[in-house]
């Protein structure tokens, strides 16, 4: 590379060493910056919507936690401004651990909801099919009590036929839920 003799003083400036890795400039569009800022603001809104127990499971520093707790108490326009501040605070930090913890919380909730739907369907099959469904439950949960299941099913059928409240059906669901939790 040719250097003009008058430009030698540029070599003496600290931090101006030639480095081929630093020559590449990463250009980010203004729209992309805005999209990232909006995504972080949405992440902040999700954090504000969480309860105290869920917030305790997410790694937040004191400033961010205080801003989130304040936003939970504020209404209307002040809340919007506070969400803007939370987005700004998130831009100054690495949001990846926060997003990961939030995803785990959501995934855990979704898994629990899916398990409950599965148990409800199993309960309905137990009431409608009887012994065939009992053998399926015993295959899934070997430590289940066959006699207790049969008694609950018999009572649930009586309640259904008598148009009574489904007390035994709820008990079947509770029993299946305890079996599923014990199985984990």
UniProtKB/Swiss-Prot annotation:
The compartments listed are: Cytoplasm
Judging by the UniProt lineage, the source's domain of life is Bacteria
What's a GO cellular component annotated to this UniProt protein?
cytosol
Q: What is its main location?
A: cytoplasm
GO molecular function terms attached to this record = ribosome binding; rRNA binding
CDD domains registered for this protein in UniProt:
YjgA-like
The segments labelled Disordered in the record are 1-21
What the entry lists under InterPro entries is as follows:
DarP, DarP_sf
Q: Which UniProt keywords apply?
A: Cytoplasm, Ribosome biogenesis, RNA-binding, rRNA-binding
Keyword Repressor listed? The answer is: no
Q: Which Pfam families match?
A: DarP (PF04751)
Instruction: State the Gene Ontology BP annotations.
Output: assembly of large subunit precursor of preribosome
Q: What does this protein do?
A: Member of a network of 50S ribosomal subunit biogenesis factors which assembles along the 30S-50S interface, preventing incorrect 23S rRNA structures from forming. Promotes peptidyl transferase center (PTC) maturation.
Q: Which family does it belong to?
A: Belongs to the DarP family.
Q: Which HAMAP family does this chain map to?
A: DarP (MF_00765)
Entry's PANTHER family? UPF0307 PROTEIN YJGA (PTHR38101:SF1)
Q: What is this protein called?
A: Dual-action ribosomal maturation protein DarP
């Amino acid at each position: 590379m040719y250097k003009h003799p008058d430009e030698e003083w540029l070599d003496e400036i600290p931090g101006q060493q030639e480095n081929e890795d630093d020559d590449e400039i990463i250009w980010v569009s203004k729209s992309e910056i805005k999209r990232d800022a909006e995504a972080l603001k949405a992440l902040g809104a999700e954090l504000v919507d969480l309860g105290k127990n869920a917030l305790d499971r997410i790694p937040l520093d004191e400033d961010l936690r205080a801003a989130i707790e304040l936003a939970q108490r504020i209404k209307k326009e002040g809340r919007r401004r506070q969400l803007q501040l939370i987005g700004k605070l998130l831009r100054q930090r690495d949001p990846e651990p926060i997003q990961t913890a939030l995803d785990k919380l959501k995934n855990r909730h979704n898994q629990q909801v899916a398990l409950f739907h599965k148990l409800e369907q199993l309960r309905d099959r137990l009431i409608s099919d009887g012994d065939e469904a009992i053998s399926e439950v015993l295959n899934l949960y070997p430590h289940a009590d066959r006699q207790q299941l049969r008694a609950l099913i018999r009572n649930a059928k009586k309640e259904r036929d008598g148009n009574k409240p489904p007390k035994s059906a709820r008990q079947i669901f509770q029993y299946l839920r305890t079996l599923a939790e014990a199985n984990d």
